[in-house]
Amino acid sequence: MRGSFHKGLVHCQPRTVTAALLLVFAQALVGPTGLCAQGAPAPANGASGLPVPRFVSLKSDRVNLRQGPGTEYPTAWVFRRAGLPVEVIKEFESWRQVRDAEGTTGWVLGSMLSGRRTAVILPWEVKAGQGQQALAVLRDDDSERAGPVAQVEAGVLANIITCDGKWCRVSVGGFRGYIEQPKLWGAYKDEVIK
């Protein structure tokens, strides 16, 4: 799953009771990070020293998405929306390989990206050229029982203020409220954003 890490245990099967007792004793000496415990792997850091993958947003209204990490590579696509969230999936020197909400990947110069967190609401529900879009409810608190502030169409861009892993507080077109985190593309499942 994107953005989450598998936690598991390495199962140890000591050959004798003595070996089992030594293992327990060794665990007591070295603490919970002993031989059998295997925690979640640390996120990989890219050339920038920042975690990969991670969400960022576009700084400019015109950002070239290139087929490779350099200006000598052809432009495959031009993003035309500042603030659009993209996921950094790889880094090479000053270039970042990114993926957008539709799954398109390519390379962008790192200076064209911002750490500002944004999200697209229900991008998988956008129906191009068809009438009414799917709606998400923006609420006045982080609960399904909270009153509605606004209804927001699929594909709308939101600014993320905070996320607690279940709900995100966002601003959309002059409205502020809470939306369920799984309805956003731009924040990982269970990710906390402060």
Model-found features: residue ranges?
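N-terminal secretory signal peptides that target proteins for export/translocation
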Residues: 1-13
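Bacterial N-terminal signal peptides
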Residues: 16-31
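Signal peptide processing junction and immediate N-terminal pro/mature segment
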Residues: 29-41
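Boundary regions of SH3-family modules and the immediately adjacent low-complexity/disordered segments
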Residues: 38-53, 87, 99-133, 141-143, ...
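Beta-loop motif signature
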Residues: 44-47, 52, 58-88, 93, ...
